[in-house]
Every structure is written in C-alpha cells, then in structure tokens.
Amino acid sequence: MMSASPPHLLIVDDDERIRGLLQKFLIRNGFLVTAGRDAAHARRLLSGLEFNLIVLDVMMPGEDGLSLTRDLRTKMATPILLLTARGETRERIEGLEAGADDYLPKPFEPKELLLRINAILRRVPEAVTAGPKYLSLGPLRYDLDRGELSQGDQPVRLTATEAALMRIFAAHAGEVIGRTELIEELGRDRSASAEEAAGDRAVDVQITRLRRKIEPDPREPRYLQTVRGLGYMLAPD
C-alpha cells in the first residue's frame, strides 16, 4: 500500500538564510517544501502549484505579507501562517484580520513553527488540502504526486534519470540547484541509472535531453534555465 503524499508547503521570506534554514528543517520533518523570495515570486509559484499551507513573512520589500494574504483570501482557502519581527498584539490582530490562520513572531524556535504547522493542518478539512498538485510548463503539465509529465491527455515518456531530475526540480521549483547537489540527489534516487547520473558532464547531458522534451525551443530554454555559475532552475508558468 502506497503512503499518502507529504503536505506541500510554500515558504515565502526575502531573507535567503532564513528561507534556506526553514526549507531544510521542514524537509527533514517530512514535508515537501517550495520556497519563494517575495510576493511576486510567490504568486508565480501559486499559479502553477497547489499547496497545503503557506508560511509567509510579513516584512518584505515590495508587496508585504499582509497585502498578499488579503489578496489570496479572495481566491483560495489555503491556510496561511504569518511570520513577523513585530510581535505586538495590534500587529497580530491585523494579520488575523487579513485572513491568516496563525501568527508567529520572530525570533522563534523551529520546533514551535513545526507544531503550529501540524496543528493548522489537523484543523483544515480534507477537501481544502486535497487536490491535484501540478506544474504548468506551457502546454505540458507535471503531476507532482504521480511524477508524470503529460501534454493534454497524452503522456510524455521520460527515462528513469529524466524522471528523477523532474522530481528534484519540481520539489524546488523557482530555486537554483547546483550541479553538485543534483549529482548527490540523483545518487540517492534509486530509479536513476548510476552510470547516467555520475559526474558534471553527465548531468549536463541529461539536462539537454530533458529540455528537448519540455522546451518549445531547447536552444533558448524558458522553463529549465541555466543560472550561470550556480546551476539550474525550473521556472514553471
């Protein structure tokens, strides 16, 4: 019997260090985690992915977390937990009035965040948290639960290593992943061929092959982008 898919969390914080620490901590505790750097980035991720819960920093440059919360509440019922350096009662009330489900002042213990997330998820009706989780890549759609790529009702065949790469990139959509990290992740994925997954050059070859299947023009990648000097990033619609 297959186990249920882990809850998918969206972490939105403009502080790269905090964002990375929270992402690693929550992944270690059994969640699927996608990270956004600001409200605009979060909107792009929300347009192509389904989340069980959003952890949202209030104090961000540009559109702040309260404004984003108010807008999201007009479109979706996904639970929102706000993080902020301002812990006054008035600020907490403002956050809850905006539509947040909970409010956690900084600094906080990661364990408390974990407990609050689990408490919110226990309260949320199944109908709210359930649903298709997919990425849109132009005419293509990637199902996160099934790990399947399709165009309309036609499946797009992926090799074991291509499928492993898609799983890795989809779990970190919008985030740069370095070659070393990709090699390590592929090495842990038993479905990927050990020979295909080994080495920087082999990863580049597999990226090129995957682009041929997901890009309108593989020579000018729109979705699977190269971030010079850093690695690769999957940028869904």
UniProtKB/Swiss-Prot annotation:
One of its GO terms (molecular function) is transcription cis-regulatory region binding. Residues 77-95, 132-236 bind DNA. The modification 4-aspartylphosphate is found at residue 57. It comes from the Bacteria. Residues 8-121 form the Response regulatory domain. Keywords: Activator, DNA-binding, Phosphoprotein, Transcription, Transcription regulation, Two-component regulatory system. PROSITE patterns: OMPR_PHOB (PS51755), RESPONSE_REGULATORY (PS50110). InterPro entries: CheY-like_superfamily (IPR011006), OmpR/PhoB-type_DNA-bd (IPR001867), Sig_transdc_resp-reg_C-effctor (IPR016032), Sig_transdc_resp-reg_receiver (IPR001789), WalR-like (IPR039420), WH-like_DNA-bd_sf (IPR036388). PANTHER family: DNA-BINDING DUAL TRANSCRIPTIONAL REGULATOR OMPR (PTHR48111:SF4), REGULATOR OF RPOS (PTHR48111). Necessary for photosynthetic and respiratory growth. Probable promoter-specific protein mediating the interaction between DNA and RNA polymerase. This is Protein PetR. The gene is petR.
